[in-house]
């Protein structure tokens, strides 16, 4: 039997099908990398605003160096997808706690974005250098501003107390600089270093300083966080209210003595050791040592409110969601 004509028909049919498939696929994905077996996705660059208000001060971003520095940080937020999205989700839990404390101490609300870039809104964050908690205090600085830091208790991981300590640090820096942008830069670069460089370089604006890369980027990262939080959808982050992390309801139990076994104590409180540690990450061991007779307040999750339910999560900021 002569199979040649049938083979041609089959091959022609396959070629036609492939052409149609490719045309459809090509219309959806604009560019294909020839010979690599990969496709290029449609990326875009977030828009750099001409200016922005930070702590009540208008910052001009049209000068080429500022524009390009700002562009770099916006791109980083846009394409570090998982980190940026998770930071927004966590902010729904922690911004409502942090904002009133900032207000109480007279700290501009924009400093919550400093916290966001320091820890990605995670109270468990720890750097390679040993900085810990939402505000990334080193041990020495934490103790200097009133936090108890030892192997048993580390209040750098305490959401409220570490925020109070951060406010005290920021206020002390403002008393020195009388400029919130300088204060923000000093949080990363150190108060003495920023003041010394401003004198040495004969500049009045912190953003005009020539600094090591990490510190030079720092204020721009804070501003980029503010821009992202003001409109996540512009970065491609289309979140629903149900995507955000809930605020876990809890009751408080005051303790003035030590606790030899936190797991057994948690069970008596109607919870688990894991959940106790989740709400009280400043407890660094499986017991509470309290030789000095201090007073501690422990958070115990309320069982009835621990579960996610459809339509039960309220966005702290409506701009974060697309619904």
Regions inferred by a protein language model and the residue ranges of each:
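Catalytic and binding regions of secreted/periplasmic enzymes and modules that target cell-wall glycans
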Residues: 170-197
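An acidic, Gly/Ser/Thr/Pro-rich helix-cap/linker signature
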Residues: 3-106
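LysM (lysin motif) carbohydrate-binding repeats in extracellular/periplasmic proteins that recognize
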Residues: 261-290
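Short, functionally critical alpha-helical segments immediately adjacent to catalytic or ligand/cofactor-binding
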Residues: 107-124, 183-190, 276-279
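Second-shell loop/turn segments in exported
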Residues: 77-88, 98-101, 121-128, 132, ...
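Substrate-binding/active-site groove segments that recognize
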Residues: 129-150, 163-165, 170, 194-197
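Extracellular LysM carbohydrate-binding repeats and other cell-envelope/extracellular binding modules
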Residues: 279-317
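Primarily a LysM-type cell-wall glycan-binding module
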Residues: 240-270, 322-323
């Amino acid at each position: 039997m002569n199979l040649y004509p049938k083979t041609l028909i089959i091959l022609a049919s396959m070629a036609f099908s492939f052409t149609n498939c490719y045309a459809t696929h090509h219309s959806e994905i604009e560019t294909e990398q020839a010979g690599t077996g990969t496709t290029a996705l449609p990326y875009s660059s977030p828009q750099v605003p001409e200016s922005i208000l930070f702590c009540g001060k208008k910052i001009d971003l049209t000068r080429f160096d500022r524009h390009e520095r700002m562009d770099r940080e916006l791109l980083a937020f846009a394409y570090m997808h998982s980190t940026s999205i998770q930071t927004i989700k966590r902010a729904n839990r922690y911004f409502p706690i942090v904002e009133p404390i900032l207000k109480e101490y007279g700290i501009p609300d924009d400093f919550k974005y400093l916290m966001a870039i320091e820890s990605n809104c995670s109270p468990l964050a720890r750097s390679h250098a040993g900085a810990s908690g939402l505000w990334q205090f080193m041990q020495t600085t934490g103790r200097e501003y009133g936090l108890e830091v030892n192997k048993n208790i580390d209040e750098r991981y305490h959401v409220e107390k570490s925020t109070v300590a951060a406010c005290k640090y920021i206020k002390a820096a403002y008393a020195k600089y009388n400029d919130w942008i300088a204060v923000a830069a000093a949080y990363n670069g150190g108060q003495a270093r920023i003041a010394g460089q401003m004198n040495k370089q004969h500049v009045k604006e912190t953003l005009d300083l020539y600094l090591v890369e990490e510190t030079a980027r720092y204020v721009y990262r804070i501003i980029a966080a503010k821009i992202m939080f003001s409109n996540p959808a512009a970065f491609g982050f289309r979140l629903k209210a149900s995507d955000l992390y809930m605020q876990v309801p809890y009751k408080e139990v005051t303790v003035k003595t030590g606790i030899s076994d936190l797991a057994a104590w948690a069970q008596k409180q109607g919870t688990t050791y894991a959940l106790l540690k989740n709400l009280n990450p400043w407890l660094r061991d499986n017991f509470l040592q309290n030789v000095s007779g201090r007073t501690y307040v422990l958070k115990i999750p309320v069982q009835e409110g621990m579960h996610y339910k459809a339509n039960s999560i309220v966005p702290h900021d409506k701009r974060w969601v697309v619904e």
